[in-house]
C-alpha cells in the first residue's frame, strides 16, 4: 500500500495547496444539498401520521446530531495521529473542527428540546441520550478551553489530544443508550444496514440534509485549517509568497 499521501499530510504547504482544490466542491455541495433537502423536507415531505408537521425539525436535528458525534470521533483520530506520528496538522485539524462540533451539538440539543416539547410534554428530561449529548458538549468545551488556555502549542496539542481520545468513549454511549437503558428516545431513524422505516418522501430529503451538513463541515473545517496553517507558518517563504499573491489579486 502506498502511504505517500499520508506522509504528505505532514506538509503544511502541500495541504494548503490541495485543500484549495477541495474547498469549492465542499461549499457547492453543501449549498446544493442543504437547499434541496430543506425545501423538500419542509415543503413537500408529507406530515407524520402521529406527530404531524412537528416532525419536520428532524431535518435539522438528525444531521446536527450525526455530525456532532462524527466530529468528535475525528477529534480522537486527530489526537492519535498527533501523539503517535507527531503530525502538527493533526492538531490544526483538531482545533479547527472542535468549535464546529460544539455548535452542532448545541444545535442538536436545542432542536431536540423544541421537538421534545410537543412530543414528550417537556423541554428537557434527564434521558440517557440527552445527558450523554450534554456531556459531549462539555467535552467540546473542554477541548476548546485547553487549546486556548495553554500557551505552549506542543503542550496544548498533547492535552487536547488526550482529552479527545479519552472522551470518545462517550460516543458509543450516545449511540447505544436507547438500547442499553429505558429512554424516551426512539431508535435510529435510519441506518446503513437496515431499510428506513419512514417512506422515501421523508428519508430522501433527510439523507440529502445529512450529506449537506457533512459537506458544510468539510468546507468550514478546511477554511479554518487553511487560516491556521497560514498563521502558524507565517515566517515560511511560501506563506509570504501566497499572501503577496492574494494581496495583488485583491488590489
Please give the residue ranges for each predicted region.
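Polytopic transmembrane helical bundles with strong interfacial aromatic enrichment
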Residues: 1-251
Amino acid at each position: 500500500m502506498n502511504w505517500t499521501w499520508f506522509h504528505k499530510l505532514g506538509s503544511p504547504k502541500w495541504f494548503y495547496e490541495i485543500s484549495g482544490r477541495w474547498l469549492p466542491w465542499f461549499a457547492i455541495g453543501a449549498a446544493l444539498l442543504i437547499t434541496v433537502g430543506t425545501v423538500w423536507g419542509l415543503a413537500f415531505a408529507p406530515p407524520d401520521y402521529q406527530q404531524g408537521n412537528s416532525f419536520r425539525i428532524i431535518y435539522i436535528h438528525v444531521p446536527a446530531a450525526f455530525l456532532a458525534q462524527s466530529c468528535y470521533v475525528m477529534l480522537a483520530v486527530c489526537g492519535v495521529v498527533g501523539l503517535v506520528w507527531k503530525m502538527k496538522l493533526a492538531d490544526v485539524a483538531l482545533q479547527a473542527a472542535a468549535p464546529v462540533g460544539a455548535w452542532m451539538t448545541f444545535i442538536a440539543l436545542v432542536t431536540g428540546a423544541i421537538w421534545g416539547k410537543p412530543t414528550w410534554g417537556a423541554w428537557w428530561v434527564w434521558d440517557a441520550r440527552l445527558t450523554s449529548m450534554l456531556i459531549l458538549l462539555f467535552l467540546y468545551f473542554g477541548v476548546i478551553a485547553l487549546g486556548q488556555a495553554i500557551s505552549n502549542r506542543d503542550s496544548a496539542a498533547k492535552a487536547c489530544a488526550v482529552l479527545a481520545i479519552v472522551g470518545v468513549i462517550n460516543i458509543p454511549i450516545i449511540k447505544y443508550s436507547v438500547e442499553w437503558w429505558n429512554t424516551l428516545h426512539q431508535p435510529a431513524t435510519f441506518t446503513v444496514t437496515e431499510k428506513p422505516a419512514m417512506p422515501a418522501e421523508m428519508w430522501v430529503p433527510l439523507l440529502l440534509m445529512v450529506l449537506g451538513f457533512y459537506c458544510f463541515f468539510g468546507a468550514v473545517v478546511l477554511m479554518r485549517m487553511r487560516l491556521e496553517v497560514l498563521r502558524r507558518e507565517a515566517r515560511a517563504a511560501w506563506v509570504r509568497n501566497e499572501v503577496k499573491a492574494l494581496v495583488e489579486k485583491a488590489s
